[in-house]
């Protein structure tokens, strides 16, 4: 699993667009997390760790503070998580995660991207069942057995632990994100090369020729959609 993840990381992982897109993405997520779970990071573990990831991605403090202040004020937009699934160039599988305050607008925007790429939007769970929804942590280390034992002792439902080139990669169900990170921190892990929740494809779909160019345009169009938060796929090129 680890090797497959590493090989596909650049293409299937969440897309990272321009800085403004990254700021907007984190701003929405922080706002929702603070609004639903409380605006004090000390009392909202999910918020604290989301802020840590935002800072690691060089999101300015004023963007973070503005999102939290907005949540403190109440009201504001009511964002809803929406997921679109389907098939792209070369019959690869696509998952598009959005946060929106207007489902009709978001669907229209995403549909335009699919149409221009000659891709097809499918029904819910049409492709996501062929991805593993995982919490992924990568950090320095070379002893996977010790890490696995510590996680099991902490009652973490671990999917896999692998070591390669001096890096430990821990995979766990996405619902185990907080439990896994807490257990790793208690082991003394303080720096993470990767710290995210992602959809990892169970199978790859090699694409070539014109499909590669179309796929690159398709991903760029999705990235330009304001409501799109993350894009995952199994295309290999």
UniProtKB/Swiss-Prot annotation:
GO annotation, biological process: regulation of DNA-templated transcription
InterPro entries: Integrase-like_N, TACO1_YebC-like_2nd/3rd_dom, TACO1_YebC_N, Transcrip_reg_TACO1-like, Transcrip_reg_TACO1-like_dom3, YebC-like
GO cellular component: cytosol
UniProt key word Transcription: yes
Coiled-coil annotated residue ranges, if any: none
Keywords: Cytoplasm, DNA-binding, Transcription, Transcription regulation
Pfam family, one: TACO1_YebC_N
Family the entry assigns: Belongs to the TACO1 family.
HAMAP family: Transcrip_reg_TACO1 (MF_00693)
Name of this protein: Probable transcriptional regulatory protein PSHAa1370
Protein species of origin: Pseudoalteromonas translucida (strain TAC 125)
